[in-house]
């Protein structure tokens, strides 16, 4: 059985979020440059520096900090997550109502969402996760193609 920790209910893959694949190395680079310049020594004299330094350290961590399935990532009001949990659906692509209005609204911004859902249904979740891992290696992130505005339903 697949480890769904990196798969959102709506069918996005967490590893393709810039919070996971782009921000950490850039934050580490900034952290290293600031360390080299001695910011740790004289920065604390600047109001807000300690909070900033702590935040930067968190961004630099490559450990996943959130999970849609735990309710700690994405909008807290997400109606897609709520619906999937109520229906006992692991991923919306496997729901009889897919794609529903909620998914269609989100797909306005995440233009690969519907094709990814169809692919997931065709090859199964395990094979789909493997494909997403390969996609991660290309440097792709959803932010590269995300269109605004899009809808995250609250119901």
Model-derived regions, located:
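Hydrophobic scaffolds flanking metal-cofactor catalytic centers in soluble metalloenzymes
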Residues: 1-91, 98-128
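Short flanking/linker segments adjacent to small metal-binding domains or redox-active Cys/His motifs
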Residues: 60-72, 129-155
């Amino acid at each position: 059985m697949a480890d769904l920790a990196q798969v959102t209910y709506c069918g996005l893959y967490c590893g393709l979020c810039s919070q996971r694949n782009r921000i950490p190395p850039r934050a580490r680079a900034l952290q290293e440059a600031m360390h080299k310049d001695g910011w740790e020594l004289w920065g604390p004299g600047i109001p807000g520096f300690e909070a900033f330094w702590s935040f930067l350290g968190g961004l630099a961590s490559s450990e996943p900090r959130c999970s849609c399935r735990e309710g700690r990532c994405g909008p807290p009001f997400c109606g897609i997550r709520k619906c999937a949990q109520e229906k006992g659906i692991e991923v919306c692509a496997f729901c009889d109502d897919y794609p529903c209005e909620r998914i269609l609204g989100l797909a306005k911004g995440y233009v690969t969402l519907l094709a990814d859902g169809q692919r997931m249904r065709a090859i199964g979740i395990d094979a789909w996760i493997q494909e997403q891992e390969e996609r991660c290696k290309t440097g792709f992130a959803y932010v590269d193609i995300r269109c605004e505005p899009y809808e995250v339903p609250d119901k």
